[in-house]
């Protein structure tokens, strides 16, 4: 979508890249998966520390067929070991209202285990 490219361009222009490319790719993939799980319910079981018990989860608010991520960036947050994935998305809720330019931020912390760094999503508070 042409409008989505403009949103992506504006995000990148407003918030210059400050993470290594590999970290940015991993964070973007995780952020997109988290947003899809949060909005549609699909894949929540993969994130128990974020969504809790999948058997007690709330019904998803958005239909998977009417959900799309318009733009996304991953950037450092307050320290080198924290990051935020900023996502702009569109979706139709269960009531049939379609809205675009919704904004969601997911926060991550970096930990090292056996010399390998991993990014862990933080639950919302």
Name these PLM-found stretches.
Residues 1-65:
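Core segments of small alpha/beta cavity-forming domains
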